[in-house]
Amino acid sequence: MPYKPKRGLIERAAVKLGVVPNTDVDANPSLPDVAALSPYASPAQWDNFAEFDAATWPRRATERRYRLVPTVCFNCESGCGLLAYVDKETNTIRKFEGNPLHPGSRGRNCAKGPATINQVNDPDRILAPMKRVGPRGDGGWQEVSWEEALADIAGRIRTALAENRHDEVVYHVGRPGSEGFIDRVLRAWGVDGYNSHTNICSSGARFGYNLWSGYDRPSPDYANARFVLALNAHLESGHYFNPHAQRISEGLARGAKMAVVDPRLSNTASMAHYWMPTRPGTEAALLLAFACVILNEELIDRAFIERWTNWREYMAICHADQAQTVDGFLATLKEEYAEFTPEYAAAECGVSVEQVREVARLIGEAGSRFCSHTWRGAAAAHLGGWQVSRCLFFLHVLTGSVGTEGGTSPSAWHKYKADLINPPPPTNQWNEMHWPREYPLAYHEMSFLLPHFLKEGRGKLDVYFTRVFNPVWTYPDGFSWIEVLRDESKIGLHVALTPTWNETAFYADYVLPMGLGPERHDLTTYETHSATWIAFRQPVLREARRADGQAVTDTRDANPGSVWEEDEFWIALCWAIDPDGSLGIRKYFESPTDSDKPLTVEEYYSYAFDHVPGLREAAHAEQLDPLAYMRKYGTFQIKDATYQCHERVLSADELHGATIDPDTHLATINGQPVGIEIDGTVIEGFRTPSRLLEFYSPTMIEWGWPEHTIPGYIVSHINERTSTNEPRTSVRADSVHPTALNHLEGNPPSDQHDRTFCLLPTFRLPTLIHTRSGSAKWLNEISQQNPIWIHTSDAAQWNLRTGDLVRITTDIGYFVDRAWVTESIRPGVVACSHHLGRWRRDSDPPSSRWSSSVVSVEELGDGKWKMTTRRGPEPFDSDDPDSRRIWWRDGGVPQNLTFPVHPDPISGMHCWHQRVRVAPASKDDRSGDVVVDTTRSMAIYREWLNRTRPTPQTGQSLRRPLWFARPLRPTDAAYRL
């Protein structure tokens, strides 16, 4: 029984007289003792879990019985585990909690996980296929059947393929959240039609990591680190936020220290031992200063550097007159980075000399347990931002913390690649609308330039699918997207696959309701820590019915309305395109047991799970097959504590037919490197052409960028005097501060009314995620505004107070927002968070009314647009009584509409930071006002295009380096010009 303190004499008398109640009596003897409570239900209870209804307490204890069905959260990219509580009486989802068996999230979720129930019950969600009526974008819609939509879409695709217009069929996705199914579809169609959002997200960082190792993402082992360097806000909102935050906290609890590099005092920075609010765009210089200290104080792992870097190649080509030894290489490094002293970094970056030196020493002293991560942040913000991740990884190479316990590993070591049934072969197509010749090194598709390419007449789209993708609101230059989405001569048919209306779906021809995270099947796997796991996202109501013995063959039978799921939709569409199999498409979507029937999701995932290492044995131990095991538990850990994969010795079978080059020591099979011989043993190495970590990149010379062969510092577009890609390894500190932004340190211009700042527009809020959180009432009650963060010293020059209106003027327009005066931002920098500023017009269907404002949109002529907020979020009538309780009236400002595109000429990453003018709002300005000139945005696109060095200029016969990975990789023949 729970502990109850003994009563004193006076209290006993009071109880006896009835003055106070006798709480010794157990009013609910059926309730368990406190000692028996657990944070989670045991998996043995998941089929029939009893819980008392909180809504009826304390009047009575009403027992509810649930089936707990595991699935995967889809409210960010972390893939955390969820348990859906399916009410056995009503067959509805009551709530979502964490899945304690999930290796990444371990039963813990952020606010976004439980808020999945809000999305399921959203009164504005789309429950049936909708087709446009009237002009595209005017707001007219009618309900149609799935059969009608499939027939229309399939007919257009069939015609496009028959007429060899393969590049006109495109699938454009934001967050896929799944592994492999859409690749199957597009390859079966024979199109190079995959487009993604990665070049507005993470391509900058990916490119820098890839140059080093051939792997484009890091996998930090935070829990075992001694020192963590974060160029992010990972305790609250960064990539793989929840799993990473847990392990950062564990590392700190074990004694690790952490430094955060960020102009903004994030919650993560507030918890760190060191906050380094650098001048935006100078982060690479700071990292090279750390390297300078580590080199000069000999805080290096000499053996690792000698064994695993391509120092011999670098010395032979660039320093042939120097000693061709590792000591000669280290001496050369000291000379190369000699000017990046702590004093230089202090002057350039605006941080203290002592802090630079102290953090550098802590990195060096941590050695193999130095851990770091960057994903967006500075790498996504600036021209040359890819050098930030490259310089960051340089610190790992110097300290030998690559692939070590407590260090940082390549992501692919901890991410499972599924073996899938009957995969189609790669296509021979190359879509230059996605991979243009101007950007041969772009790490992902140049997706944010699609409207500009269409306007230039580079091509057209006949069938354009958008999925988990809202570029009108999420991307820069959203009005240019509206212009091309409305134009049927540029986009013939736009199909929006979405559970909810959004700013891009308003300009579609079909809006087809796809299932939310708990309403569809997906296989997920992410590099959340030093282990490898898979998780099964499944439609929980369908699975609950199946477990109860009901026959369900189509997810629409269990989902709300006629909401479908992608897998079944794509299978049906492929059969509609190729009903008799004559096009060679249908065969990839036929049942393996009966070719006259479509492939089922059960068959697809059964094959995938049958081939997961160790899963069959784990399932057999419980007398289950692998699919049943995954349905029951939702997750499986394949490997734990995976380190040092580059040292793996290759087997005789792996080396069958291999030859060893006597000079490079590369082991190759049919000309393809498979490993490297070191000290007489052939081991795996890394995925670079040399199989070593490439400090020196011959690729950069081969593709026309010889000034960037080694880690360096490129002047950001925020700070540059002229449009250039000048490296900074040869620029002295006395020429650091450009005149373009000399207002950034509090030096007012002659016109006090209008000042130039750096706008930081990309930071996330812990409670929101892109478009998806707009329909979650709990999340929007927590976070509704995205004010302008401005330092107290900057605000004082205008006597600005929190809540005052300010106008932010970009190169193509302006927006009006409210100020938040704070010391949590570096002077000379203003910041505005992502996620907010959702909008709809009166003519549009009700959409995300928990978060969106009603606006008017005017075309003023000559490419000029104006958006005015008419009213913010307000109460509305629905089946959810909370919709009448909305108390907030500000939905934020859609700042991205006012940003021109800034494509980095090398990585292809959109450089998010903006050089803006800030001033108090004029008397006619209103919060939420947006004015944009798309003619000017097109001119800026061309200015940035002129920075590129297109493939023909380099003398290359290839479109792209063959060793660079890319999504939906075509045949090698397609790479050739």
Task: Place the predicted regions along the sequence by residue.
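N-terminal export/assembly segments and adjacent metallocofactor-ligating motifs
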Residues: 1-299, 465-467, 511, 517, ...
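Glycine-rich phosphate/diphosphate-binding loops that line cofactor/substrate pockets in enzymes
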Residues: 150-168, 218-227, 336, 357-372, ...
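Extended redox/cofactor-interaction regions of prokaryotic respiratory oxidoreductases
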Residues: 182-248, 254-259, 285, 392-510, ...
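Long, well-ordered, tryptophan-enriched scaffold segments
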Residues: 255, 259, 264-367
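Long, C-terminal catalytic modules of enzymes
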Residues: 539-636, 865-889
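Surface-exposed intrinsically disordered loops and tails
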Residues: 546-560, 587-598, 648-674, 726, ...
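Short conserved beta-strand and strand-loop elements enriched in small hydrophobics
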Residues: 802-813
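Short, solvent-exposed secondary-structure boundary/capping segments
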Residues: 823-836
